Regions:
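Rhodanese-like catalytic fold shared by cysteine-dependent sulfurtransferases
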Residues: 1-33, 41-82, 91-154
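Active-site flanking residues adjacent to catalytic metal/cofactor-binding acidic residues
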Residues: 36
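Short, surface-exposed ligand- or partner-binding patches at beta-edge/loop junctions that are enriched
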Residues: 86
Length: 154
């Protein structure tokens, strides 16, 4: 049986990553590819990279194809376009980028360390209303909230 981290590790052999620091410099220079945030809508609404689009991981595959309720034309038409996939910690984005590559996307990378790393680098973030979210607020919003019953028994 494979665990989640095993799946991520396998996908990392096939997926390129870009660090928040390297991509942040490029982003701030105005050279911005398609930013695809695959977190859940509530996560995205709380904070995201300005200019990113939200397509939750659970509907990603349908969003990349025509004729579905979830179809996102920008994605369907973007198979040759440079795409940076974003999640909270950089794991879901690796799995999503791997699937997108299998679906014919030729220039897709995962944001290493996810939006957490972006926040740690104190790069621009906003909420659903377009209000700036500073790094301290980002720390609070991105803090792990694993409950005792969710932890592995000892």
């Amino acid at each position: 049986m494979k665990r989640y981290d095993d799946l991520v590790e396998e996908a990392l052999a096939r997926v390129k990553e870009v660090t928040p620091w390297d991509f942040g410099r490029r982003y701030q220079s105005g050279d911005v590819p398609l930013l695809l945030d695959i977190r859940e809508p509530s996560e995205f609404a709380a904070l995201h990279i300005p200019g990113s689009i939200n397509v939750p991981r659970g509907i990603l595959e349908q969003s990349c194809e025509w004729d579905y309720d979830e179809t996102v034309p920008e994605l369907v038409q973007g198979r040759e376009r440079e795409i940076v996939v974003i999640c909270r910690s950089g794991k879901r984005s690796v799995l999503a980028a791997d699937v997108m590559q299998q679906m014919g996307f030729s220039n897709v990378v995962s944001l290493k360390l996810g939006i957490r790393g972006w926040n740690d680098a104190e790069l621009p973030m906003e909420d659903a209303g377009g209000n700036v979210v500073d790094a301290d607020a980002g720390d609070e919003l991105l803090a792990s909230r694993v409950k005792p019953e969710q932890r592995k028994p000892k």
